[in-house]
């Protein structure tokens, strides 16, 4: 269970970093928002899923 928690936490950190870097880049490019809106929303959805997954797994690890 600890390994699953660590992998979920690592995925959360990676997705968070990608969103912190990627969203401003998308918004800064001309027509970037119109072309990449679904990608940004997918990343945000994955981020929220990982937040809840890490929270649930944390209750089993501790």
From Swiss-Prot:
Disulfide bonds: none
Cellular compartment(s): Plastid, Chloroplast thylakoid membrane
Membrane topology category: Multi-pass membrane protein
Listed GO CC annotations: chloroplast thylakoid membrane; photosystem II reaction center
Any GO BP annotation: photosynthesis
Transmembrane segments: 8-28, 41-61
Pfam families registered for this protein in UniProt: Ycf9
Membrane in keyword set: yes
Subunit annotation: PSII is composed of 1 copy each of membrane proteins PsbA, PsbB, PsbC, PsbD, PsbE, PsbF, PsbH, PsbI, PsbJ, PsbK, PsbL, PsbM, PsbT, PsbY, PsbZ, Psb30/Ycf12, at least 3 peripheral proteins of the oxygen-evolving complex and a large number of cofactors. It forms dimeric complexes.
PANTHER family (alphabetical): PHOTOSYSTEM II REACTION CENTER PROTEIN Z (PTHR34971:SF2)
Function per UniProt: May control the interaction of photosystem II (PSII) cores with the light-harvesting antenna, regulates electron flow through the 2 photosystem reaction centers. PSII is a light-driven water plastoquinone oxidoreductase, using light energy to abstract electrons from H(2)O, generating a proton gradient subsequently used for ATP formation.
Family: Belongs to the PsbZ family.
Name of this protein: Photosystem II reaction center protein Z
Organism of derivation: Chlorella vulgaris
């Amino acid at each position: 269970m600890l390994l699953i928690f660590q992998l979920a936490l690592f995925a959360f950190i990676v997705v968070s970093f990608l969103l912190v870097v990627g969203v401003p880049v998308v918004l800064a490019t001309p027509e970037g928002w119109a072309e990449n809106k679904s990608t940004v929303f997918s990343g945000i959805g994955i981020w929220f899923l990982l937040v809840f997954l890490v929270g649930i797994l944390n209750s089993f690890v501790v």
